[in-house]
A protein has these predicted regions:
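Alpha-helical scaffold elements adjacent to nucleotide-binding pockets in ATP/GTP-utilizing enzyme cores
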Residues: 162, 186-190, 210, 214
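Non-catalytic accessory segments of DNA primases and related replication-initiation nucleases
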Residues: 1-62, 71, 83, 93-102, ...
Length: 220
């Protein structure tokens, strides 16, 4: 683990809670229906853009990290619970940056949410793989605690090897767009699925919808 990841994650969590620094981030999470309980459970934070009020944090240990500016942040943990990276979901559009960004880590060997949900996944002997981190968090908040993210439509054989320790059934549910269809086809073309039962769930959501938006619509 990079030695300052815990420190940086704490900075983002404090920024989100700050009445002025975190306002944009909190407003965004409110529009997504994310509760305070969920924010605390998943250690969600906010990477503020530009100048920080002098009364935010005067401690020398906190520095103005910039890679994830304008993003809601999530710590990424391995299945053993060790923090491997921090990811950010874009809220403020900056240049041509991708929707999700993160510090380098071995994304082929980590699934977002597996650590938090592994007990339910083992109990149900089933896991749902989706693209976005907010899909996982929204599902958890609404009681569906067997979901993990492959950081986009990028499920790998390494992921399958890890999943096999917890579940025998995998439902791959990617977005109904080109990237989602490409990712689903890639899983279909794997050289082997081992002893896993893999369901490639296509055509479930209407165009431009994902698991997160579907859950919000059908949980009302």
């Amino acid at each position: 683990m990079r030695p300052d990841l815990e420190q940086e994650n704490l900075y983002y969590r404090k920024a989100l809670k700050h009445p002025t620094v975190g306002l944009i981030g909190r407003n965004y999470l409110e529009t997504r229906g994310i509760t305070e309980e969920t924010i605390d459970k998943w250690e969600i934070g906010w990477s503020p853009v530009g100048c920080i009020p002098s009364n935010f944090d005067k401690s020398d240990e906190f520095k103005p990290w910039t890679k994830l500016w304008g993003r809601i942040t999530f710590p990424i943990t391995s299945q053993s619970g060790e923090m491997a990276s921090i990811s950010g979901r874009q809220v403020i559009k900056i240049d041509n940056k991708p929707k999700y960004d993160h510090y380098a880590f071995s994304a082929r060997k980590i699934l977002f949410g597996l650590y938090q949900n592994k007990e339910d996944i083992q109990k149900e002997d089933r896991i749902i793989i989706t693209e976005g981190q907010l899909d996982v968090i929204s599902a958890w908040q609404n009681g569906l605690k067997i979901v993990a993210s492959s950081f986009g439509a990028h499920c790998s054989l390494d992921h399958f090897a890890i999943i096999s320790r917890y579940a025998s059934v995998i439902d791959v549910i990617y977005d109904e767009d080109n990237a989602g269809w490409t990712g689903t086809q890639a899983v279909k073309d794997f050289s082997t699925w081992g002893d896993l039962i893999v369901n490639l769930r296509t055509g479930i959501f209407p165009a431009k919808e994902d698991l997160d938006s579907w859950i919000k619509t059908h949980s009302k």
